[in-house]
Amino acid sequence: MSRYSTISLFSGAGGLDLGFVQSGRFRIVFANEILLPAAVTYSRNLGLRLEVCGDEPRVEAQPGTIMACDVAKLDFTGLSGVDADVIIGGPPCQDFSIVRGPDWDRRGINVKRGRLYAHFVRALASLQPKAFVFENVPGLVSANRGLAYKVILEDFARLSIRWDEIKRIVSSNGNGGKVEGYEIVFTGIVDFSKLGVPQKRERLVIIGLRKDLAGGGFETISRLRARIDHVLSGKRWLLHRYPLTPIEVFEGQPLDRLGDKYKEVMLKWEGVWDEVGTERAFEWKRRVWDRLTFDIISDYLSFNGIKHADKQELEEALMQHEVLLKELGYYGRPVYSLKLPDSTTEPPYEGKAVVERMKRIPPDENHEFVRGTRWEVEGRGISLVYRRIHPLKPSYTVVAYGGGGTHGYHYDRDRATLTLRERARLQTFPDSFLFYGKKPEIRAQIGEAVPPLAAKRIAEALAEVLDAV
């Protein structure tokens, strides 16, 4: 099978790109990232030559490189001979993110359009690839009361008309030839846990196919859309109903072989309600502890709201978990057995107060569990602070930034902060993928990334569409 040539923008450490490469159907011919540590990580793992731009206002994009510079500097004419099939990426999304703050601060892009987004459009107009993948945070859909999302979809679909308006933002003379717009063959918020990622992480994904390739009318487009939706909804596998869990990716074994480990982990929490002594703690005992069976399969089904599980279906789901662990490279390799040279397996520094606090916060609970006690955290009003992941449920979203209490916490009572490698596993990075930079920079690289497994599924869906046209 042929491999489609791909250009990546806003590439970060390469999570999205790695998934496309792992699919076996795409090869990355050029990438761009403004942050040097992330670009170094990308180069050393994905093999593109690193080029660091100087002070010149304009640089020609060079095939076979990842260029560390502002996308505004890039002259895409250097890639015209590549005949790019696909452009992938998503402009930095902090301003769109719901996690970042209240609604008034969720600005998105205004009607004049954000500068970085406009450069993604510039690449489409200049290079006219067969298809594109644009990913971003779900909050983009509602930013500016939905105006940002509407403008983006219309820009992609009516690029031949909108390009004259957009190119003024990026000070570009643009493409001298005809500019084709794109048929949107998929747009939606994708829950990556339904694709096998052991984490509740949602992203907006938009996939476009160049209009001259999308001929055949409504019926053809509907068929292509249905094909992508079938993959990205997770319905091709049982994982959309039976999610992969943190205990599996940390231990390197499927659930049905982790019964003793699970029981050991949960029994450590016996009596925590008496230590904390609050009504919330005693309510947790009634609501959670008293309902535990300590049978890993029964509790897994209960915690994930899976009712009427068919025995044969459950067995098939557990087999898919084993296959997936092997696909990820985690099978038979507990994360705590790893000693990697990039510092990601090193135990993080933890103050005594944090350790003592976390000993009183059970899985799936947060700092509010110890409110009104001597372990209370002052001035904390958001639920993601000091939150423990649960061994049998997809973890909460791995975040890139934040101060005390936002680093992610292990389900084992004898553990507190997750290591960077544990965070990388929750993001489905292979253990062979090494990160470069200072620890806060590595944390950001991991947290900002699209999970490679999710990217691989997106790539597989896109390859089916490109093969069909």
Swiss-Prot record:
GO biological process, one term: DNA restriction-modification system
Biotechnological utility: This protein may be useful as an epigenetic editing tool due to its high thermostability.
InterPro entries to which the protein is assigned, alphabetical: C5-Methyltransferase (IPR050390), C5_DNA_meth_AS (IPR018117), C5_MeTfrase (IPR001525), SAM-dependent_MTases_sf (IPR029063)
Keywords in alphabetical order: DNA-binding, Methyltransferase, Restriction system, S-adenosyl-L-methionine, Transferase
Thermal dependence: Optimum temperature is between 70-90 degrees Celsius. Highly thermostable. 34% of the activity of the unheated sample after incubation at 90 degrees Celsius for 10 hours. Lowest activity detected at 10 degrees Celsius.
Catalytic activity, EC: 2.1.1.37
Superkingdom, natural source: Archaea
Reaction(s) the record says it catalyses: a 2'-deoxycytidine in DNA + S-adenosyl-L-methionine = a 5-methyl-2'-deoxycytidine in DNA + S-adenosyl-L-homocysteine + H(+)
Statement: the UniProt record of this protein carries the keyword Methyltransferase: yes
Example of a GO MF term: DNA binding
List of catalytic residues: C93
Residues of the signal peptide: none
SAM-dependent MTase C5-type domain sequence ranges: 4-469
Sequence similarity: Belongs to the class I-like SAM-binding methyltransferase superfamily. C5-methyltransferase family.
Protein name in the entry: DNA (cytosine-5-)-methyltransferase M.ApeKI
